[in-house]
């Protein structure tokens, strides 16, 4: 198929049909009515707003998660916003059906209505970037800006989003670090179409800075501060938020995820295929990978605290890195880490090390030498120096248990204690993690060399 045929076939799969559009519009209308009823019943000075892809009509067929914001006036205290916003969320959640509490910057409600997940989030009713008080406030401005500037390019955005999902580069969550939906929308608006964005992959990396909102002309000093800050942090892309010059929309985008986009764009333009949008699942045998590489897999299994992924997974990542560093100090070579809500993978060179360490001590005729002599069990002389043999745990499980016991590793504050009581598995993972282990060991997660067969 040529590129136009591939795009047309992709569109057939990702653009909502009329029946689905009617369902979404009816759903939003019913939820909005219930939200207004709730606000009135509680006698709140607040307004309901829909934000996100459903509100912008850039959602993919079958993807109906809905974000409803309860916006309070700017003179509302943060404490009152949290209290009343959560109260409204609970009452509305009960009307919609079942709900649960979730936690981010402040608590919010996750409900479900007619099979669709609905996040009910309190925020401030901001009119400009200068009004922003909490991290979620901009979402209202984002939705309004996209609707005003998209100008019929909804399906171009859908193509780009599905492409990013297919190449595993979609999602700005801290544990993904890919392209957010809003970033995808900005790039389509900036460059005009899905294909134009792909064609500009190399250009935007070299240009580095995208200022669709023309903030350099309107707020040059603030914008330059943003650019300087982000450049110092070596971000692959700086996209000044069209509604707020203080923010880089691509702040969470990692070099790895941009790299997937960079190579996939080049490959798709050279050899278009529906596979980029809808790839087959990569599967393999992690045991075969271990045999091929001659390395070992250490798996930590633990029961995670009840936190949303945005709060939990960065802490698990920090812990995985801390354990890797601790093992390196102990003499093991760590080739890579991976993690999830309840596991950490560490690929290491070996699982056994010598059970003794040789320590070089002070000169034998000094007071320090006397203390060294008294402290150690097996002591000998090499030249003027005292030497000693220290017993250490040789098996990596023993080493990790000693690291846990002493707490000698960097870890997320909410996960350190549960990590200490982890089950430690060597070269084996439970069946649900088998393919995850394969993807990690084979490095397929960030593989940019596609098969040409």
Swiss-Prot record:
Its EC number is 2.7.7.72. It is an enzyme of class 2 (transferase). The keyword ATP-binding applies. One of its GO terms (molecular function) is ATP binding. It catalyses: a tRNA precursor + 2 CTP + ATP = a tRNA with a 3' CCA end + 3 diphosphate; a tRNA with a 3' CCA end + 2 CTP + ATP = a tRNA with a 3' CCACCA end + 3 diphosphate. Its cofactor is Mg(2+). Keywords: ATP-binding, Magnesium, Metal-binding, Nucleotide-binding, Nucleotidyltransferase, RNA repair, RNA-binding, Transferase, tRNA processing. Pfam families: CAA_C (PF21133), NTP_transf_2 (PF01909), tRNA_NucTransf2 (PF09249). CDD domains: NT_2-5OAS_ClassI-CCAase. InterPro entries: CAA_C (IPR048833), CCA-adding_arc (IPR008229), CCA_tRNA_nucleotrans_2 (IPR042090), NT_2-5OAS_ClassI-CCAase (IPR006116), NT_sf (IPR043519), NuclTrfase_I-like_C (IPR011068), Polymerase_NTP_transf_dom (IPR002934), tRNA_NucTransf2 (IPR015329). Mg(2+) binds at residues 65, 67, 119. SUPFAM superfamilies: Nucleotidyltransferase, PAP/Archaeal CCA-adding enzyme, C-terminal domain, PAP/OAS1 substrate-binding domain. The keyword Amino-acid biosynthesis does not apply. ATP binds at residues 53, 56, 142, 161, 170. A single active site specifically recognizes both ATP and CTP and is responsible for their addition. Catalyzes the addition and repair of the essential 3'-terminal CCA sequence in tRNAs without using a nucleic acid template. Adds these three nucleotides in the order of C, C, and A to the tRNA nucleotide-73, using CTP and ATP as substrates and producing inorganic pyrophosphate. tRNA 3'-terminal CCA addition is required both for tRNA processing and repair. Also involved in tRNA surveillance by mediating tandem CCA addition to generate a CCACCA at the 3' terminus of unstable tRNAs. While stable tRNAs receive only 3'-terminal CCA, unstable tRNAs are marked with CCACCA and rapidly degraded. This is CCA-adding enzyme. The gene is cca.
């Amino acid at each position: 198929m040529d590129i136009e045929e591939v795009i047309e076939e992709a569109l057939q799969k990702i653009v909502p049909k009329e029946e689905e559009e009617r369902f979404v519009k009816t759903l939003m209308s019913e939820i909005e009515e219930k939200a207004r009823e709730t606000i009135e019943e509680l006698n709140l000075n607040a307004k309901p707003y829909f934000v996100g892809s459903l509100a912008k009509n850039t959602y993919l067929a079958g993807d109906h998660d809905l974000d409803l914001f309860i916006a309070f006036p700017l003179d509302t205290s943060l404490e009152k916003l949290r209290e009343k916003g959560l109260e409204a969320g609970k009452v509305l959640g009960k009307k919609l059906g079942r709900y649960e509490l979730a936690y981010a910057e402040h608590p919010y409600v996750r409900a479900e209505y007619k099979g669709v997940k609905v996040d009910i989030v309190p925020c401030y009713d901001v009119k400009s970037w200068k009004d922003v008080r909490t991290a979620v406030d901009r979402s209202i401005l984002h939705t309004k800006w996209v609707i005003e500037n998209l100008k019929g390019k909804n399906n171009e955005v859908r193509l780009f989003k599905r492409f990013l999902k297919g190449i595993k580069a979609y999602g700005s969550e801290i544990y993904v670090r890919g392209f957010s939906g809003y970033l995808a929308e900005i790039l389509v608006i900036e460059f005009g179409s899905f294909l134009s964005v792909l064609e500009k992959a190399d250009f935007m990396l070299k240009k580095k800075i995208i200022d669709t909102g023309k903030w350099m002309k309107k707020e040059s000093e603030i914008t330059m501060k943003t650019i300087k800050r982000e450049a110092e942090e070596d971000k692959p892309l700086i996209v000044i938020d069209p509604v707020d010059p203080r923010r880089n929309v691509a702040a969470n985008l990692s070099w790895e995820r941009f790299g997937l986009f960079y190579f996939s764009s080049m490959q798709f333009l050279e050899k278009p295929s529906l596979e980029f949008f809808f790839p087959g699942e990569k599967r393999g045998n992690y045991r075969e990978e271990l045999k091929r590489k001659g390395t070992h897999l250490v798996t930590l299994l633990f029961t995670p605290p009840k936190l949303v992924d945005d709060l939990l997974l960065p802490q698990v990542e920090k812990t995985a890195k801390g354990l890797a560093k601790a093992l390196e100090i102990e003499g093991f070579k760590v080739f890579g880490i991976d993690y999830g809500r309840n596991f950490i993978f560490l690929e290491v060179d070996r699982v056994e090390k010598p059970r003794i360490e040789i320590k070089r001590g002070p000169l034998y005729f000094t007071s320090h030498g006397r203390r060294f002599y008294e402290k150690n069990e097996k002591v000998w002389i090499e030249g003027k120096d005292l030497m000693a043999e220290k017993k250490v745990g040789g098996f990596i499980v023993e080493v990790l248990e000693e690291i846990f016991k002493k707490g000698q590793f960097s870890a997320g504050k909410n996960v350190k204690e549960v990590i200490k009581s982890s089950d430690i598995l060597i070269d084996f993972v439970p069946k649900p993690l088998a393919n995850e282990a394969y993807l990690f060991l084979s490095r397929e997660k960030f593989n940019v060399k596609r098969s040409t067969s």
